[in-house]
């Protein structure tokens, strides 16, 4: 799955109309572009409220115990109602599956992963905003002639985890990973 979210007016102007990675533009406005090669579940919750799920949503936990399966828009109504009442940051941890979501509420954008962080979501602060991606090669740091390494990330990859950096780190100093129960806004 390839997903890239571009935030910030200057970044959007730079990338607008450029399909440098051969993936579809899902959403496009003055200060936000969402691109993906994966079919997504898109739902318009209300006026100026939209949510995209990239990946697979299995169900939602009710009362933190029972799992209610979801498969279509009518099944997602419980999720939408909960988001309207409690907010996306309180509801997303009760949604089961392997996914990345993009929630647009008027001029505010929230991006995150499922409660277990099963799909990595990387971000790089860039110009006046940020660029988030499911893959490192979709971020602009690679275009820089001098790549700087994150020493903590390198140490964890070599000594602690054996193959990868700690959850919020990457091997690169300018690129971070969205942590568990964390939203990029």
Question: Which positions does each model-derived feature cover?
Answer:
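Cysteine-centered catalytic environments shared across enzyme families
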Residues: 1-185
């Amino acid at each position: 799955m390839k997903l890239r979210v571009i935030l910030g007016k200057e970044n959007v102007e730079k990338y607008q109309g450029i399909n440098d990675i051969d993936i579809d533009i899902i959403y496009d406005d003055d200060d936000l572009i969402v691109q993906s090669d994966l079919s997504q579940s898109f739902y318009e919750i209300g006026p100026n409220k939209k949510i995209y799920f990239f990946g697979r949503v299995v169900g939602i936990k009710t009362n933190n115990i029972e799992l209610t399966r979801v498969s279509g828009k009518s099944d997602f109504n419980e999720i939408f109602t909960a988001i309207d009442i409690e907010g996306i940051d309180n509801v997303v941890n009760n949604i089961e599956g392997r996914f990345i979501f993009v929630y647009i509420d008027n001029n505010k954008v929230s991006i995150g992963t499922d409660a277990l962080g099963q799909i990595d979501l990387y971000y790089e602060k860039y110009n006046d905003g940020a660029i988030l991606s499911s893959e490192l090669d979709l971020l602009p740091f690679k275009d820089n002639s001098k790549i700087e390494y994150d020493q903590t990330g390198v140490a964890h990859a070599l000594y602690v985890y054996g193959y990868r950096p700690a959850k919020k780190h990457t091997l690169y100093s300018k690129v971070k990973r969205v942590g568990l129960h964390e939203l990029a806004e």
